[in-house]
């Protein structure tokens, strides 16, 4: 019977590892004050795998990442109060489940790492969150990726891009911009436009 016990324990351990690989802790209520684990099903992640797998180059992968992050946040909103999150910090002021740029940069970095851990980012690697300061006191953070091909080029700095989900309502595509443009202040808050994706993965921008 001992072999049966080991078999059961081994199966449980494998299931736990698989479950962990499909889970992410999302932050909300500003400053990552609250964290909640959300779990993505195999079928949900398979949709994203197929969606990202079509990308033929880094430009296309960034375009598809924009929608993929929006979808992951929408699915997370089905298990947590972040469905109430709106672009910027004013449209959802005081709402439980609201997210500031710290919540977004932390959560989106974790979502990007989830995709990377599955091997679905072929043209980018996940970098540390970026930050910018405007008007002395306006500090803003964003998740960040760097292009693999450019980082491997001799003598060249890697091309970096922000993946900023803070600008949009929950479920909307994340804003993806060259880091230099973002540091110069690009990126506009959009709210009240409705979700691009609800329920299942849309498969293409609308």
What does each model-identified segment do?
Residues 183-206:
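Low-complexity, Gly/Ser/Thr/Pro-rich intrinsically disordered linker/tail segments
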Residues 113-183:
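Hydrophobic/aromatic-rich core segments of domains that either
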Residues 34-35, 51-62, 90-103:
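Second-shell loop/turn segments in exported
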Residues 1-9:
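Sec-dependent signal peptide recognition
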Residues 69-124:
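Mid-length scaffold segments of soluble, non-membrane domains
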Residues 13-16:
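N-terminal signal peptide c-region/cleavage motif recognized by signal peptidases
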Residues 19-37:
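Short N-terminal segments immediately surrounding and downstream of signal-peptide cleavage
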Residues 43-77:
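N-terminal, post-signal-peptide region of Sec/Tat-exported proteins
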């Amino acid at each position: 019977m001992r072999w049966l016990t080991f078999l059961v324990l081994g199966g449980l351990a494998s299931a736990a590892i698989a479950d962990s690989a499909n889970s992410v802790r999302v932050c909300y209520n500003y400053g990552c004050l609250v964290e909640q684990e959300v779990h993505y099903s195999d079928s949900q992640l398979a949709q994203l795998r197929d969606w990202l797998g079509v990308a033929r180059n880094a430009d296309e992968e960034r375009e598809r990442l924009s929608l993929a992050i929006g979808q992951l946040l929408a699915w997370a909103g089905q298990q947590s109060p972040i469905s109430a999150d709106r672009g910027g910090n004013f449209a959802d002021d005081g709402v439980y489940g609201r997210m500031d740029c710290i919540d977004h940069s932390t959560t989106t970095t974790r979502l990007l790492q989830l995709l990377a851990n599955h091997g679905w980012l072929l043209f980018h690697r996940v970098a540390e969150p970026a930050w910018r300061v405007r008007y002395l006191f306006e500090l803003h953070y964003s998740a960040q990726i760097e292009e693999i091909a450019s980082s491997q080029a001799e003598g060249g700095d890697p091309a970096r891009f922000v993946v900023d989900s803070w600008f949009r309502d929950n479920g909307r595509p994340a804003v993806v911009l060259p880091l230099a443009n973002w540091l110069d202040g690009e990126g506009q808050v959009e709210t009240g436009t409705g979700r691009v994706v609800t329920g299942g993965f849309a498969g293409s921008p609308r």
